[in-house]
Amino acid sequence: MEIRIVAKSYNILNDEEILIKDGKGYLFGNKLSYLEDEGIRNEVSFNENEILIERVGNSIISLKLNEYSTSKVTTVYGELILDTYLIDFNQNDDIWFVEYKLFLESDLIGHFKVIWEIEGLI
């Protein structure tokens, strides 16, 4: 189903807000798909035991509530394997969100909250 989506990422460590997408997206049950302005496809899946955030060709973030998971991020320096920890999440008809932390080895390198506002059919 074609929808309008507003996706924002909040970097809690750096107190930054980034608008990821404001425009058309697609909703298929528990899967949300959209293109960033640069043409990079993002896919978000809320599954029974895991939330997956994929920036196709760049990263796959695996999140499990109150558990450490392993994620892959491709950088100009190669592929990084990071640990992720899901703090909170919600999924309803209008808003999906996740709050998670990223660790490289045991060092905290990121704390993010990502919100996807689903505003209905276009």
Language model: regions and residue ranges:
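Terminal leader/tail segments of proteins
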Residues: M1-I122
